[in-house]
Amino acid sequence: MAEQPLIGKTILTTRAAGQSSPFAAQLRAAGAAVIEMPTLEIGPPSSWLPLDEAIAAIADFDWLILASANAVEAVQQRLAAQQKSWSDVPCAIAVVGQKTAQVLAAQGGKADYIPPEFIAESLVEHFPQPVAGQRLLFPRVETGGREQITQALQSQGAIVVEVPAYESRCPSQIPDDALIALRQAHLNLISFTSSKTVRNFCQLMASNLGVDWSARISGVAIASIGPQTSITCQELLGRVEVEAQEYTLDGLLLAIEQWARQTT
């Protein structure tokens, strides 16, 4: 039988509705009891028009920047709406992260550039050619996203065209099983995969459990997928006990397993 370092641990995951289950399955395979508390709801932007117009003019761009699987899926949807496929995208494609590249490949596209680290800063730092004067299309979350990619590319002379491709919203309710676990302090660890999951978690806790909600997780370890998420955890939760060294879900799982071995 495979090693199960998470036996006896109860872990709360906070990914988007519909996106948590594969990671939850990995945690369960490692022995954890998992409670899913989605802190994001992914949906369409307020209007498809900017993305549709950009896709119609895709030949005018030198690069397409895809920073998440959500962006890949949105572009795929709007390509199909114009009776197009990834083979109709003449510009080079840059993606953040192997998982994003895998989603792109599954849709029939191919990444021309994947940065060595799975964070936005790495995409800019290791960009394979000078971007001065280049036109870059950047489909992204409509509100609440980070500005680092755009600002860094623009500082190097790139012309970055941002278009809303999807929106991520905070759910209004906490699932009953998660609410019970939080009220009864039946948790060992809470995992976060983005700054937005941290912010929305805090919003949900305040609206559902009152102003003293933080006391309910005072003895619960906080796990972060990477340094930017950790900064937000420190700002809003005051601590981070676990941080992934590789900024992926696999890296987060490994870090949680190492934490469990040290706390057993």
From Swiss-Prot:
GO terms for biological process: protoporphyrinogen IX biosynthetic process; uroporphyrinogen III biosynthetic process. Gene3D superfamilies: 3.40.50.10090. Belongs to the uroporphyrinogen-III synthase family. Pathway: Porphyrin-containing compound metabolism; protoporphyrin-IX biosynthesis; coproporphyrinogen-III from 5-aminolevulinate: step 3/4. It comes from the Bacteria. This is Uroporphyrinogen-III synthase. It comes from Synechococcus elongatus (strain ATCC 33912 / PCC 7942 / FACHB-805) (Anacystis nidulans R2). The keyword Iron does not apply. GO terms for molecular function: uroporphyrinogen-III synthase activity. CDD domains: HemD. InterPro entries: 4pyrrol_syn_uPrphyn_synt_sf (IPR036108), 4pyrrol_synth_uPrphyn_synth (IPR003754), UROS/Hem4 (IPR039793). It catalyses: hydroxymethylbilane = uroporphyrinogen III + H2O. The lineage of its organism: Bacteria, Bacillati, Cyanobacteriota, Cyanophyceae, Synechococcales. Catalyzes cyclization of the linear tetrapyrrole, hydroxymethylbilane, to the macrocyclic uroporphyrinogen III. The keyword Lyase applies. Its EC number is 4.2.1.75. Pfam families: HEM4 (PF02602). Keywords: Lyase, Porphyrin biosynthesis. PANTHER family: UROPORPHYRINOGEN-III SYNTHASE, CHLOROPLASTIC.
